[in-house]
Amino acid sequence: SLCKKGVVMENGQVAFKGNIDDSLNYYLSNTPQDSDKKIIDYVKVYKHTLHLSRILINDREYCRSTIPSDQHILSVQIEGETEEDMKTDVMLMLKTKDGTTLATLAEGHYKGRIEMIPKGHFCLKKEIQLPLYLAHGQLYCDLMMHHPMVEWQMQAHGCCILDCEGGQDAFGFAITMSEAGLF
């Protein structure tokens, strides 16, 4: 191997030195996602006629939430105002820590269920059916509003971490995403 050492820089300063795996883990674990930061703070791309006031994932405004092992519905709520009538769909992508997409949840895109939002105040609510068994681990979320195949109206990449409690196998060991996959 050509490279055996890794260095992580922050604001022009060395923040961490170590081997490649440790450096990568340090970089990925020190993302700007603090539990006291709101999901709406991660909205970086949005349509100029769209003004968001509140975003909730799993009934929380903050970017970290827990999914207990007996939870089977994941809720998403987006509130705000629009200056024009808008056709939209909510897309939620669930990813691993390193950015590998595990699932994309977008009913409008897959089933043609596009919402028509009239000009003015709106409150979009989506309930997503979770698998019966969800493995233990963390899911990193990207949340988007879009008119499928037409335009992106809002993008919030890396806006939420879902800590999944997961279940246990027959021998009492936790079933983890890294070993067994998502579900």
Regions found by a protein language model. Give the residues of each.
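Localized sequence-composition bias
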Residues: S1-F183
